[in-house]
Amino acid sequence: RRRGVEMLFHPGTHDCVAYDMAWGGAEHPDIPVYLGANTGHGKRGHPRLERGQSNKSAFLLTHFFPEEISGRLLVPPKVEHALVDDAIEVIVEFPDGYEPEGGSIWWMFDRAPDGSPQYLSEPIPDDNFAEMHYDDRRGVWCAEIELDANAEQIDFFSIYLSRVKHNGRGYETYLS
């Protein structure tokens, strides 16, 4: 970043070449990432996966032709969670000026360790999906996930939509 380099990391949640997402997110939280649910080399993706995303095109157009772009790419948000009775509330806040148009969340209980065969092969269940909602009072995006009483851990990630335009053509972009 000191050299003016822009980055967008675009792995899948089940990709054999990007199995260390949790480590990467913890060590480099300022790098924008898009995680397609259940995607990776040879993976079909989750039934609720975003179709028609144009992240790479939007990223390149924004980088090389910034004066010709309307709209802006999102930056990584601040993510927090809190236990609420038998659920976990996920709270996501974007910096001022970065307003997503919508969001969704996926989760898995007791996912296998990073890089293990099970980590890469066991998909996020089809039903483990919800739309995020915007809380006007708090100025944050929220979702509540009912916890599995038998689970020891939960992995969740959320995705947010923004659009940019170049020469009248719209590009849907997503950020996790």
Each language-model region and where it sits:
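Catalytic histidine-centered segment of alpha/beta-hydrolase-like enzymes
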Residues: T39-Q53
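Active-site proximal loops enriched in glycine and acidic residues that flank catalytic Cys/His/Asp
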Residues: P11-T13, A37-T39, V92-F94, W107-F109, ...
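Short conserved micro-motifs at the rims of enzyme active sites and ligand-binding pockets
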Residues: D20-A22, G45-L49, R169
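C-terminal beta-sandwich/jelly-roll accessory domains of carbohydrate-active enzymes
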Residues: P95-S176
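Surface beta-strand/loop "capping" patches
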Residues: F59-W107, N128, D135-R137
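Alpha/beta-hydrolase
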Residues: M7-A18, I88-E93, E101, E144
